[in-house]
Amino acid sequence: NTAKRTLEKLLSVCICLCMLGAMLPAQVFAEEADTAQTETVQDTAPKDTVYLSSADDLIQLAKNCRLDSWSQNRTVVLQADIDLSSVDFNGIPSFGGTWEGQNHAITGLSLSQDGSVQGLFRYVQQGALVRDMTVKGRIKPGGTRASVGGIAGSNAGTIENCAFDGVVSGTSQIGGIAGVNTVKGSINGCAVSGTVYGSHFVGGVVGQNDGVAANCTNAA
């Protein structure tokens, strides 16, 4: 009887050990899968968001935006006020993403290069969104000087809750927010103060408006 009870105990221990061994790989696999999933999210998320906190950051962004598609499906977050008064900055060539200004200001903007379609953004693409930002500066290009705006030379996206304070000067299609607001463009809740000069199609908010402009104020 003693031998029989000892054998039964040994069998019970063996069964328990086998059950534990079967459970451990599944648990380890689940933990590894969770870790892999977390690492995947961490690797991909930052690639879609760009943070700006200095003039150098903005200059690098402008270089990247020479390629029209670079900013598409990206979010740009302005994390601090940026002063451009002591740097060489010629505007952002083309923007097609989402710009979150977070109520910060870009000051000291000075654009004087020759050509048309000038502004902080030369082109705001269809589907793009620029919002919650103040721009202060002087935009007086040389040469043809058409389609000049404080925020955008040409807008085919949405500009909302933005303000411009300063001087915008050109020949035709001159506006405090946008030189041209295309048929796909929308400008909403924006404000302009300062001076806007031009000969043809001149407006405090937008020079030539083919789209929607609403709830804006003009003190230019």
Role assignments for model-derived ranges:
Residues 1-14:
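Bacterial N-terminal signal peptides that target proteins for export
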Residues 29-220:
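Surface-exposed repetitive/solenoidal architectures
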